[in-house]
């Protein structure tokens, strides 16, 4: 479902030119999660494109006027107008665990395309998604072969009770849910390490999970052909994190 402030032909023009940035939002009990953080990241994406952002008050009003459990707001730029499109996420929400793989498509060099630019025109993300097949998501490596992230998710590993996730210096998007999950884990007494992660570590980890706005913590039980991953702890954390977020709102 799309909702637009201006003519759809202008929106389509902007989308085909790739002049569009977006944010995916999630609501809990009718309240948007991390609205201010999503706005700040949207503002940063627009700043890369030298586009003046909307005021937070206007953004907030827009979100509440189009509220749904999971939604995406796309800002497009055409003919000197900043426009918006709303898309409601209609995918099945409940998922116990998922299968992922490592794609051969590398994350773009961060010096060429900033990792925190959430643009519809990113060729690396698009090409990686074409390799997804029946996987929930595919994990992209960086220019040095390090683990970066999924095409729409961040990656966490659990090894010997320690949580490990690629650092921002690895060339990843500073995921909002990632940030909250790190905070949640530390407040729960777990050790969290942010650093460069080698691909082999994914296969030797005790557990692996993804994080993203729409679904919070998503346990991974299979990477490629390796179907031996436990999801015991990550499944418990998935439920606990949802309750944690609700308490914050």
Give the positions of each predicted feature:
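Helix-start/capping segments and mature chain N-termini
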Residues: 1-65, 82-249
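Ordered, amphipathic secondary-structure segments that act as subunit-interaction surfaces
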Residues: 69-77, 87
